[in-house]
Design a protein with these regions (language model features):
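Extracytosolic (periplasmic/ER-lumenal) interhelical loops and adjacent juxtamembrane/interface segments
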Residues: 29-52
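N-terminal signal-anchor transmembrane alpha helix
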Residues: 4-25
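Hydrophobic alpha-helical transmembrane segments
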Residues: 57-80
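Juxtamembrane/interface segments at transmembrane-helix termini
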Residues: 135, 139-144, 174-189
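N-terminal secretory signal peptides
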Residues: 76, 80-153
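N-terminal secretory signal peptides and thylakoid transit peptides that target proteins
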Residues: 148-166
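Structured, non-membrane catalytic/scaffold regions adjacent to prosthetic-group chemistry
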Residues: 23-26, 69, 112, 178-514
């Protein structure tokens, strides 16, 4: 048992440090995960996204936490030669080890690894590991039988140390709970608008329902994907393992750089006071697989980006517009795209302030490009002469990120048992090109049947489609779907993965007819 003292110390010290680190801004595990993710080869990352989808990032993060624990065991073993030191000296040695780890992290990781909270975290990491070694040493009898004299005195000392340890754990738990509560309040507070919402800010759901019901005629309302996605159901993809929480009271948006004559700084209230417009826009993640659900539609309200650029006096030399965000994310758009009236700096989503996970207090929304080109938690806007290589581009993903034509079968669901009166339905999307036709095949693509199309909410959203036909009882039905965009180009049948420019191919479903 005595030989396990320091490895166990490393395990317990590491776990304590990992738990405590989640209350630091930013947590060490997040920095390590972000850094490791940024150096992961793009092809491997794309493969993992295709195969693991939404569970990939949590698994990656848990792996990083596991590495922290292993590092704690290694650190504890490094302290073994110092095991005979008195407690104050041992704790000092632990702090010294933490300082060495902090310096190594700064050299290897750079950036946020030099933040005071992280440096302090490494120092505490070493101290906690050393302290855990002392406690476990006493528990295993080494301290009780030797350094502290009589066994009874050793036991009393151990009980006192154990009580202190338990108290420390309880205090840490209480602090963690308080931190979570404060964080939750921060998220709630930051998601609230700077002032009361005006009636004109709200989506008129009745008007939306009148102009486009969002369900196929003659079908139950729950049968198809709604034309407008509720905020709670809107897909979420982020490079971060823990997203930033931004306080609207201290936030500002800056239009800056050498290519503007009059730099502008706007508060949240000032941004919301500017003339605005609303657009229905569908966003799709570039990592969305064929038939995947990383695609949603919302009504976005904000200030046209071109108005802000003109207000700042953008110079003629500008060719691109770059964005930086609260989480360190950078992205850029070609100038012609930035000047489109539909490219917005938005602050409302479906009539509500942007949820924190969707970029509160402001984000970019543009049309015809994958979600990576719509940065969240916006902080600065800067006209530039060349494109900025963003997070995804550095991993080999497409710089243009133009949406490809896609179509999806939502009804019936895969392997569902259906009646002979068979109804198919789903969505099709082609960015700014629109959808001209959707077709369904039940004979492997030999023949195609035209589907009925619902009128889209705007030229920039998906189109709902449906088709009814008779099927023979007891049969197995295999269905394929394809779409034709507004230019007349038919969706490609060639199947490709999402990396590096978006997936292609036909969505397919198989059903049993009762």
């Amino acid at each position: 048992m005595r030989s396990l003292r320091w490895p166990l110390a490393g395990v317990f010290g590491s776990l304590a440090m990992v738990i405590w680190s989640f209350e630091m801004p930013p947590p060490l595990a997040q920095i390590l995960s972000d850094r490791m993710l940024s150096i992961t080869p793009g092809a491997l990352f794309g493969f993992l996204i295709d195969k693991l989808q939404l569970v990939g990032k949590p698994l990656f993060f848990l792996g990083t936490v596991g590495l922290e624990v292993v590092a704690g065991v290694v650190a504890a073993l490094l302290l073994v030669p110092l095991a005979r030191l008195r407690p104050p000296a041992l704790l000092a040695a632990g702090a010294a080890l933490g300082a060495v780890l902090a310096a190594l992290a700064r050299a290897l990781l750079g950036g946020e690894a030099g933040a005071p909270s992280v440096v302090a975290g490494f120092l505490i990491y070493g101290v906690v590991t050393a302290a855990a070694g002392l406690l476990l040493g006493a528990a295993l009898g080494e301290e009780a039988s030797g350094r502290y004299g009589q066994p009874a005195q050793g036991r009393r000392r151990f009980l006192g140390m154990a009580a202190a340890a338990i108290g420390g754990v309880l205090a840490a738990g209480a602090a963690l709970e308080i931190g979570r509560t404060l964080r939750g309040l921060g998220e709630h507070g930051s998601a609230a608008p700077a002032g009361p919402l005006e009636i004109s800010d709200l989506v008129d759901l009745g008007e939306v329902a009148d102009t486009h019901p969002g369900v196929v005629r003659g079908l139950p309302p729950a049968s198809l994907t709604p034309a407008l996605t509720p905020n709670r159901d809107f897909y979420v993809i982020s490079k971060n393992f823990l997203d930033p929480v931004v306080d609207a009271r201290s936030w500002s948006l800056r239009i800056q750089g050498p290519l503007v004559a009059d730099p502008v700084t706007l508060s949240y209230e000032q941004l919301r006071a500017l003339p605005s417009r609303s657009e229905y826009v569908t966003l799709e993640c570039i990592s969305n697989d064929v038939g995947g659900h990383l695609m949603s539609t919302a009504r976005w309200t904000g200030v046209p980006l071109r108005d802000l650029l003109r207000h700042a006096g953008m110079r003629d030399a500008a060719r691109w517009v770059a964005f930086t965000c609260a989480d360190g994310y950078v992205e850029s758009l070609p100038l012609e795209q930035a000047l489109e009236p539909t490219t917005l700096v938005v602050y409302l989503m479906n009539g509500e302030p942007l949820p924190s996970k969707h970029g509160f207090p402001a984000r970019i929304i543009t049309t015809g490009r994958y979600g990576m080109k719509n940065p969240k938690w916006l902080r600065t806007i800067e006209p530039v002469q060349a494109p900025v290589e963003g997070f995804w581009e550095k991993q080999g993903w497409s710089t243009e990120a133009l949406v490809k034509t896609t179509s999806r079968i939502d009804l019936p669901t895969e392997h569902q048992r259906v009646t002979p009166d068979l109804t198919f339905g789903g969505v099709a999307f082609a960015g700014t090109r629109g959808i001209k036709r959707v077709e369904l095949s039940t004979d492997g693509g030999a023949t195609w049947l035209p589907a009925e199309l619902e009128r889209p909410l705007s030229p920039y959203t998906w189109t709902l489609w449906y088709l009814t036909r008779q099927a023979r009882r007891g049969s197995q039905v295999s269905a394929l779907v394809r779409a034709t965009d507004g230019t007349g180009a038919v969706q490609t049948a060639a199947s490709t993965a999402s990396y590096p420019a978006g997936s292609t191919g036909y969505d397919a479903r198989r059903f049993s007819v009762d």
